[in-house]
Amino acid sequence: ASNGGATTSKVTARSLDEIKKSGVLKVAVFSDKAPFGYIDKDGKNAGYDIVFAERLAKDLGVKVKYTSVDPAARVDVLTSNKVDITLANFTVTDERKEKVDFAKPYMKVALGVVSPENAEITDVSQLKGKTLIIAKGTTAESYFEKNEPDVKLQKYDQYADAYNALLDGRGDAFSTDN
């Protein structure tokens, strides 16, 4: 899968001139998905997507205003013009392309599955009848709903909640981009 930055297409997004004139690039990012986007020990946004956003802002001669976003809200914050761009591990899909425009992808990802050492999952077939923890609105959600109907999905709004569910033993495994 490919991840690209995205802007709105069905509503009128701010133009580059409008962004420059305002002095602020509004960017949606994750606050709990290291190493992509997270809040560091000093309470500041950090991660790869943050570095990318800072570079875009520098090139435009503006400052960045970050908005933390849940995976399922990445399209909504764009279509409502709450942000100019989403940099939140945002995989290009046909469904999303109907609502927003994507830039060229800036990284490639694949789905991974993490499980406890004492119940290691090494093949997707081992998930049949098991509970898989995922974040809502993610590639993992759409993949497993479409391709693995025998896997029970336990969905969370926040990545941090999904990670904690695995640590607490509320599911057999957790799937996300690796």
Task: Go through each PLM region and give its residues.
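A ligand-binding cleft/hinge motif common to bilobed small-molecule-binding domains
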Residues: 76, 90-98, 145-146, 160, ...
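Ligand-binding cleft/hinge of the Venus flytrap
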Residues: 40-41, 53-62, 140-157
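Ligand-binding "clamshell"
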Residues: 94-105, 109, 149-150
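Short, well-ordered beta-strand segments
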Residues: 26-30, 114, 131-133, 174
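Flexible hinge/capping segments at coil-to-helix
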Residues: 115-132
